[in-house]
Amino acid sequence: MKKIEAWLSKKGLKNKRTLIVVIAFVLFIIFLFLLLNSNSEDSGNITITENAELRTGPNAAYPVIYKVEKGDHFKKIGKVGKWIEVEDTSSNEKGWIAGWHTNLDIVADNTKEKNPLQGKTIVLDPGHGGSDQGASSNTKYKSLEKDYTLKTAKELQRTLEKEGATVKMTRTDDTYVSLENRDIKGDAYLSIHNDALESSNANGMTVYWYHDNQRALADTLDATIQKKGLLSNRGSRQENYQVLRQTKVPAVLLELGYISNPTDETMIKDQLHRQILEQAIVDGLKIYFSA
């Protein structure tokens, strides 16, 4: 104790009031340092330091909203892990950016992020086939549902396999397969169809589910297709279809446009439009398996 008092006397701090002032000043300096040091992390604004992408969620599996460039500025509104939720103040568009592409002190992930579809088994069920032609159009093209469900499924199969998924098809050619024999197990089951009504006015796409464990997949695919597709959106709905009822795995029935509607038929026939829909489905599956 005497040594402490001697040191205080030497420094001219023997007076208790002076000591309190010094301690308060030191604590203020420490607080100010901590505040300034955390400012870059908690700042309301961030700057992009290298070209990157604005995504719909905090993961590289989420779809890209648009490209961002070095020097762009955003308002920071949230953070999950190393991903920053931002808002474009000019357009009010919200999205997520990997923190290491910003001026924030966030170290990049050096490990390659695993593709969420890697190792997953996806069952594709092209509706109808053979003697069961499904719906048909009333235009000069006389398009048949069974043909375009198969085209879509085959194109989607190639895209999914490139992503590392294993794909099982309930049919690969123009043959009839009973509903009972379409019950194939996998991590996800997609039954692909085109809708039709007597009236040519009905249009758009619908995602159907039946069991409760199928709804999350249906809602996710509905959101990603709505984001990218040109078809009007009729939402995600519960329906008692046999292909959904007889399987217990996450399954959906996709009605990708009304073949009885001339505008929808044009999009169903167009390969580029199908590819956009197919990529939206892949994006949705990635998000679903990343959750």
Swiss-Prot record:
Domain MurNAc-LAA residues, every copy: 122-286
UniProt GO BP: cell wall organization; FtsZ-dependent cytokinesis; peptidoglycan catabolic process
Signal peptide: 1-40
Domain of life, per lineage: Bacteria
Organism: Staphylococcus aureus (strain NCTC 8325 / PS 47)
Function comment: Probably involved in cell-wall metabolism. May have autolysin activity.
EC number(s) stated in the UniProt entry for this protein: 3.5.1.-
Name of this protein: Probable cell wall amidase LytH
Family assignment from sequence similarity: Belongs to the N-acetylmuramoyl-L-alanine amidase 3 family.
Chain segments carrying region Disordered: 118-140
Record carries keyword tRNA-binding: no
GO molecular function: N-acetylmuramoyl-L-alanine amidase activity
Hydrolase among keywords: yes
InterPro entries xrefs: LytH, MurNAc-LAA_cat, N-acetylmuramoyl_amidase_3, SH3-like_bac-type
Compartment(s) of residence: Secreted
SMART domains: Ami_3, SH3b
